[in-house]
Amino acid sequence: MRSLWKGSISFGLVNIPVALYPATRSEELKFRLLRSSDLSPVNYKRVAQADGREVPWEQIVKGYEYEKGKFVVLKEDDFKRVDVEATQTVDIMDFVQLDEVNPMYFHKPYYLVPDKGGAPAYTLLHDVLTETKKAGIAKVVIRTRQHLAAVKAQGQALVLEIMHFAQELVDVGELDIPVAKGGAKRRELDMAKALVEQMTETWQPERYTDDYTSALMAMIKEKIESGGKTSGAAPKPRRATNVIDLAAVLQESLNQTGAGAKKKPAKTAKRGKSRKAA
């Protein structure tokens, strides 16, 4: 795997040479738009809204719409004037307790791998973050854009987690979330806790697969093999129902989970003492 860039982690006077690698991969299927008559791929053209004419690249400029229909044009020199220092450095500004950071701030992880001569300092930072349960909050430039990021210890590696800036998150106060008067009823709360307990498992991420993509890929293969035909009708979507009697629904859920996949094995019956022959 090729690194995205090579640079360094910087905090205080310490500089650790590292290489940045992606920690995720995209499994999304890609589709092309086609003309239905002959399946010819459809291309896009740059067309002006005013007259519908195609616009060549040399006549295109970037503009910011500050009012409806009003634009200010920005040239390449304008972007360069406000460009942040595009050094390939993970510049740690602060260290914070990891459990203080709302997980909603985390966006996308990358691996940081020590480069030549960086192993001792890399290991030191990794162990410090592990023992203190802290993360380094940094700024880093990736592909010409500056990001907020957290440097975290993950297993044997250091992970650079790209974060959202505070203004990018929607405040929950902007949402109209209804709350039941008096809170949840005690009986329903106890039953819900029992249901959660019955459904609790040890975290095993490999158990959770992308069933939609798998089914879609299987259908694509079927269409290829059958010349474009598919068998069977599409499943009917489930209709959402308004829950009126929560207690009854919870009890039914408890009955199903208790007798279903989580059913405990029956205990072996104890043998009684054998009687002596008369």
From Swiss-Prot:
GO molecular function terms attached to this record: double-stranded DNA binding
Compositionally biased residues, Basic residues: 261-278
Signal peptide range: none
Known function: With LigD forms a non-homologous end joining (NHEJ) DNA repair enzyme, which repairs dsDNA breaks with reduced fidelity. Binds linear dsDNA with 5'- and 3'- overhangs but not closed circular dsDNA nor ssDNA. Recruits and stimulates the ligase activity of LigD.
Species assigned in the record: Opitutus terrae (strain DSM 11246 / JCM 15787 / PB90-1)
Domain Ku per the UniProt entry, residue ranges: 9-172
An example Gene Ontology biological process: DNA recombination
Coiled-coil ranges per UniProt: none
Region described as Disordered: spans on this chain: 255-278
Keyword terms, alphabetized: DNA damage, DNA recombination, DNA repair, DNA-binding
Quaternary structure annotation from Swiss-Prot or TrEMBL: Homodimer. Interacts with LigD.
Taxonomic superkingdom: Bacteria
Family under the similarity heading: Belongs to the prokaryotic Ku family.
Record-given protein name: Non-homologous end joining protein Ku
